[in-house]
Amino acid sequence: MEKKWIAILGSPRRGKNTEGLMDYYIKELEKRGRKVDKVILSEIEQNSCNGCEYCIRNNTCHHKDEISSIIDKIKDVEGIILGSPSYNYNVTSYMKIFLDRLFSLFDFGNGSWSSQLDSKGIKSIVIGVCAGPDSLSMGFTIEAMKRVMMDHGVEILIEESYFGTKRNPVDRNEEIRSEIMRKFDEVFLS
């Protein structure tokens, strides 16, 4: 059976730091025999959650857009890559819409909740990128993506925080590829 991953890019800026870093991770996954589909959130039809709670009653979102089909695909993947630059200390609005829509994967009943992704063994790589010099500049970007993944029972394999893109853009950083390869070796060989 083919091992599939899905990469969700929250940056509207094509070919820049977040996508460059994500592409390095995609190449490493492909080297290890994984098929990776990349979704550019800024280029697809998406509707934001309006809090109607249709999903609580029906186990699916009432919106029928490209986000809905991506959510259906997520149920059958080995792993998910989430990548977003930090916009005002948080994920982009594109990523926020996507994360909010994942709420439709929760099952509510008997006074508790669980995720349709629980016990599927799905893994994730979470990537945050910012121009600022340190983790304070990143704000909640990584945490926002991690929390949603963890609530769905998705294991975080790698958490990548990349700072200082103004002085050290991804495409000029010679060391980042070898660092990513090292992280993959630690995770995939252990």
Model-identified regions with their sequence ranges:
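N-terminal beta1-alpha1-beta2 submodule of the flavodoxin-like/Rossmannoid cofactor-binding fold
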Residues: 1-84, 88-107, 157-158, 167-190
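Short beta-strands and strand-loop turn motifs
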Residues: 8, 126-129, 160
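Short, glycine-/small-residue-rich phosphate/pyrophosphate-handling segment
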Residues: 110-155
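Active-site rim beta-loop-alpha module in soluble metabolic enzymes
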Residues: 164
